[in-house]
């Protein structure tokens, strides 16, 4: 099953990749490995202003932060679909995923998972 179709089956709507703003490529393929640049929680385009920003939990609720993380992963999946030409999802492996949360100083009072 194609990756996009699997995500649709899981009720995950994956938009087209967001156009980069700046001098970088959104992904690069080296020796069969896909390196995807960091994604931000934006819906639509970065210039549209539909981006979630702020520190958790002082400026952004934990619930909003979870939604932001979900948006970042969906944006990553969009690039993965493009980079793999929407290949079958069982042919794709993952080596590493990193995520970053903007929180207050040493704030460990919340969990995003």
Language-model segments: residues:
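Short, polar/acidic, helix-capping and beta-turn segments at strand->helix junctions
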Residues: 1-113
